[in-house]
């Protein structure tokens, strides 16, 4: 919204800064951070009052969780999403279609997660919205988003998959790209959702991934930098750096309240939405495969659940003591802070590896 002030730079030279994505990204970070800081306590109090017993805790998990996490309110993702929306509307170029596509997926997935959390809290059970129904709605939202991205992007490129390390290798999937893109977004949303099981575990890797993809979006949306790095130029996609900045700011604000012992959980409201946001940015910037590297921690968590379920159904035996894998390490004797901080370190290393693919080609 504030970008229009740049039109008056002739009369007010200082307004010229609103043209720059870097400046507006910084503004989005600060705005989202302050918003969550200021309104977070009130939102947490409201959630605690409305929810009563808070998020139901798994009885088959680590016994310490029954003592340390009981009564903690969920749906804290509302804080994050509010910060993202306010900062994006204030600092992003609202005429950019990519901005609305990413916001649409984020809020759509957030609504799914909110309803899921609502069912769990009101019924005090882990059985919220059925898995099939949830995946079906997610697929519809993601499918619409991908079709829009395909329609506004450059013909040929918008339906192709780019591969890291190979500057000229593109696999044009044609209309089948809609299925691939839909899978990326839905998988990202659910992978982040599975990661959100310990205080602070999901939000920091999400911020790391958002920072990485904000950087990628800025480079891919700049014809000079894209040409220098020999990555595919996508006109207009640089504006997504502002949304990624908003996520980072809102995430930092949320972490203040989510640091152990957490005052609030983001719930499916936040985890599904943030994962969907990252997946959509990856599709728009043509870095879907790089998302699997930068977000490798989320992939690991999701794969651990798949392996556990498949193994148990086929052999009756479990590969891990408990899935997702962060609970496996808890069962091995790692303390919650050890698991969380070590997983953060893994997320940083994977992000650096993913960013290295921009140059190693």
UniProtKB/Swiss-Prot annotation:
NCBIfam families: mraY (TIGR00445). This is Phospho-N-acetylmuramoyl-pentapeptide-transferase. Belongs to the glycosyltransferase 4 family. MraY subfamily. Pathway: Cell wall biogenesis; peptidoglycan biosynthesis. InterPro entries: Glycosyl_transferase_4, PNAcMuramoyl-5peptid_Trfase, PNAcMuramoyl-5peptid_Trfase_CS. One of its GO terms (cellular component) is plasma membrane. It comes from Xanthobacter autotrophicus (strain ATCC BAA-1158 / Py2). One of its GO terms (biological process) is peptidoglycan biosynthetic process. It is an enzyme of class 2 (transferase). Keywords: Cell cycle, Cell division, Cell inner membrane, Cell membrane, Cell shape, Cell wall biogenesis/degradation, Magnesium, Membrane, Metal-binding, Peptidoglycan synthesis, Transferase, Transmembrane, Transmembrane helix. One of its GO terms (molecular function) is phospho-N-acetylmuramoyl-pentapeptide-transferase activity. It holds the Pfam family Glycos_transf_4. Its cofactor is Mg(2+). It comes from the Bacteria. It catalyses: UDP-N-acetyl-alpha-D-muramoyl-L-alanyl-gamma-D-glutamyl-meso-2,6-diaminopimeloyl-D-alanyl-D-alanine + di-trans,octa-cis-undecaprenyl phosphate = di-trans,octa-cis-undecaprenyl diphospho-N-acetyl-alpha-D-muramoyl-L-alanyl-D-glutamyl-meso-2,6-diaminopimeloyl-D-alanyl-D-alanine + UMP. Catalyzes the initial step of the lipid cycle reactions in the biosynthesis of the cell wall peptidoglycan: transfers peptidoglycan precursor phospho-MurNAc-pentapeptide from UDP-MurNAc-pentapeptide onto the lipid carrier undecaprenyl phosphate, yielding undecaprenyl-pyrophosphoryl-MurNAc-pentapeptide, known as lipid I. The keyword ATP-binding does not apply.
């Amino acid at each position: 919204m504030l970008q229009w002030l740049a039109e008056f730079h002739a009369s007010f030279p200082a307004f010229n800064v609103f043209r720059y994505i870097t400046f507006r990204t910084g503004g989005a970070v600060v705005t989202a951070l302050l918003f969550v800081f200021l309104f977070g306590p009130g939102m947490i109090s409201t959630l605690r009052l409305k929810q009563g017993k808070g998020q139901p805790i798994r009885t088959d998990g680590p016994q310490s969780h029954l003592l340390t996490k009981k009564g903690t309110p969920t749906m804290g993702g509302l804080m994050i999403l509010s910060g993202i929306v306010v900062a994006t509307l204030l600092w992003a170029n609202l005429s950019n279609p990519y901005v609305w596509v990413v916001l649409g997926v984020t809020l759509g997935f957030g609504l799914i997660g909110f309803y899921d959390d609502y069912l769990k809290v009101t019924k005090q059970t882990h059985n919220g919205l059925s898995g099939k129904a949830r995946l079906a709605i997610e697929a519809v939202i993601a499918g619409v988003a991908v079709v829009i991205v395909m329609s506004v992007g450059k013909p040929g490129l918008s339906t192709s998959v780019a591969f890291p390390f190979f500057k000229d290798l593109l696999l044009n999937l044609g209309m089948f790209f809609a299925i691939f893109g839909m899978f990326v977004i839905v998988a990202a949303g659910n992978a982040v959702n599975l990661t959100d099981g310990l205080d602070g575990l999901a939000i920091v890797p999400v911020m790391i991934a958002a920072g990485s993809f904000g950087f990628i979006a800025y480079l891919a949306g700049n014809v000079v930098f894209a040409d220098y790095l020999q990555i595919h130029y996508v006109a207009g996609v640089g504006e997504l750096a502002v949304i990624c900045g908003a996520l980072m700011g809102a995430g930092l604000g949320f972490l203040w309240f989510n640091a152990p012992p957490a005052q609030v959980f983001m719930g499916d409201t936040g985890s599904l939405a943030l994962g969907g946001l990252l997946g959509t940015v990856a599709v728009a910037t043509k870095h879907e495969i790089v998302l699997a590297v930068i977000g490798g921690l989320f992939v690991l968590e999701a794969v651990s659940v798949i392996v556990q379920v498949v193994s148990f159904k086929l052999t009756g035996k479990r590969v891990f003591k408990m899935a997702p894998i962060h609970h496996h390490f808890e069962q091995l004797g790692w303390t919650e802070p050890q698991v969380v901080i070590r997983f953060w370190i893994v997320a940083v290393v994977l992000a650096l590896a993913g960013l290295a693919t921009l140059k190693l080609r």
